[in-house]
């Protein structure tokens, strides 16, 4: 694989004369001194797309969070979009949006700032978006199958939501299922396959019992909540320590996130969505990027991620926008330190940093001549990799100076 990429890079270099592909790409970016000036060109690029994916190079990019929040509010001026969030569970959103009643879910914790993962919701940089969602100005939904607020109430919620479920959870079954589920949420590595089999079987029995539920919307949402619980159970079954298991777990999660989005769009056919996630999950063909590291240089060939699933389900209706930076720093809001962002000298970001622009946008989807162009970029976690990026993302947003996320006191 490495030899093939080197050959492709050589062909790219020859076809571009003496100008490296990275500089060729960088020279085509529209430059902006203020980030808001880029929003109208982005709006034009995503026009008529039902799904807009907004990524981030890392989950600690404060300036990226800020710009994504501003961009969402700009694109949603006339309520054209709902926001679908990585880091928020499927059931959380159904309850928070009033589609299902809270029942046994503690109302003291029932808030978007608690239900959305703290990596984003507890930062100053997303505060305007969180406030807009909290006030009802922006509609939202959760797409994650990772443990979130409602998961801690899932078993009692299922029991309280429908009389059909009571018979499945009679006797000691409720306590046994609760105990196993708590350990699943805690990613307990001592869980046995028998215990996980028991959990999966009972969840499927609950699903079967819900066939008698007469409220079709409730039934549909609870059915998806069970799907999400089983998806995470599948990740726990694989484990989080072995290399192959971790990577198969990524595929399980991305497939379920895509199914959650697909369910939402099919359920509400008049709605469009903006998805908040990482560049990695937004990749439409991650296999076109060369991972190139041991122990598995061809790792990306094994992934089918959120963006790719959605492109297959909604062909031509997905625009995936990656965010990247040419300098500054990144850091989690809860950490005192930060890490400098220093683009590799062979990367597109290095070339962009020498153009001197504060912000930049490039609509890759309009450059069909770049489809097979191989160039180096740090789009995925600020790690410099070669690949056919125009097959992986539809657009790139460049930030000259990023900064760490900052905690907000609510």
Language model region names:
Residues 1-24:
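Bacterial Sec-dependent N-terminal signal peptides
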Residues 16-410:
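Structured catalytic-domain cores with a bias toward divalent-metal coordination
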């Amino acid at each position: 694989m490495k030899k093939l990429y080197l050959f492709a890079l050589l062909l790219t270099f020859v076809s571009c004369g003496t100008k490296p592909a990275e500089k060729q790409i960088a020279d085509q970016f529209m430059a902006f001194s203020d980030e808001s000036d880029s929003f109208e060109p982005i709006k034009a690029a995503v026009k008529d797309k039902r799904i807009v994916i907004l990524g981030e190079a890392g989950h600690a990019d404060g300036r990226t969070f800020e710009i994504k929040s501003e961009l969402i509010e700009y694109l949603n001026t006339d309520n054209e979009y709902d926001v679908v969030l990585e880091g928020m569970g499927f059931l959380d959103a159904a309850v928070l949006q009033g589609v299902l009643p809270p029942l046994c879910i503690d109302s003291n914790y029932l808030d978007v700032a608690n239900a959305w993962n703290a990596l984003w919701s507890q930062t100053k940089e997303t505060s305007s978006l969180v406030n807009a969602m909290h006030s009802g100005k922006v509609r939202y939904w959760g797409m994650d199958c990772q443990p979130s607020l409602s998961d801690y109430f899932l078993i009692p919620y299922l029991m309280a939501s429908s009389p059909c479920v009571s018979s499945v959870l009679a006797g000691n079954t409720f306590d046994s299922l609760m105990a196993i589920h708590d350990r699943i949420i805690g990613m307990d590595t001592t869980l046995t396959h028998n215990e996980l089999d028991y959990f999966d079987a009972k969840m499927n029995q609950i699903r079967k019992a819900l066939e008698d539920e007469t409220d079709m919307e409730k039934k549909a949402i609870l059915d998806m909540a069970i799907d999400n619980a089983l998806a995470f159970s599948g990740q726990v079954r694989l484990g989080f320590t072995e290399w192959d298991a971790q990577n198969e777990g990524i595929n399980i999660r991305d497939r379920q996130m895509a199914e959650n989005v697909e369910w939402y769009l099919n359920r509400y056919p008049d709605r469009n969505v903006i998805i908040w996630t990482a560049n990695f999950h937004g990749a439409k063909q991650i296999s076109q990027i060369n991972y190139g590291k041991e122990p598995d240089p061809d790792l990306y060939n094994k992934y089918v991620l959120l963006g790719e699933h959605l492109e297959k389900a909604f062909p031509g209706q997905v625009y995936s926008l990656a965010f990247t930076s040419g300098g500054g720093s990144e850091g989690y809001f809860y950490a005192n330190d930060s890490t400098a962002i220093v683009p590799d000298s062979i990367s597109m970001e290095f070339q962009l940093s020498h153009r001197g622009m504060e912000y930049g946008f490039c609509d890759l989807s309009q450059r069909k001549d770049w489809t097979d162009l191989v160039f180096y970029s740090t789009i995925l976690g600020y790690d410099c990799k070669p690949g056919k990026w125009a097959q992986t993302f539809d657009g790139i947003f460049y930030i000259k100076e990023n900064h760490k996320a900052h905690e907000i006191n609510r």
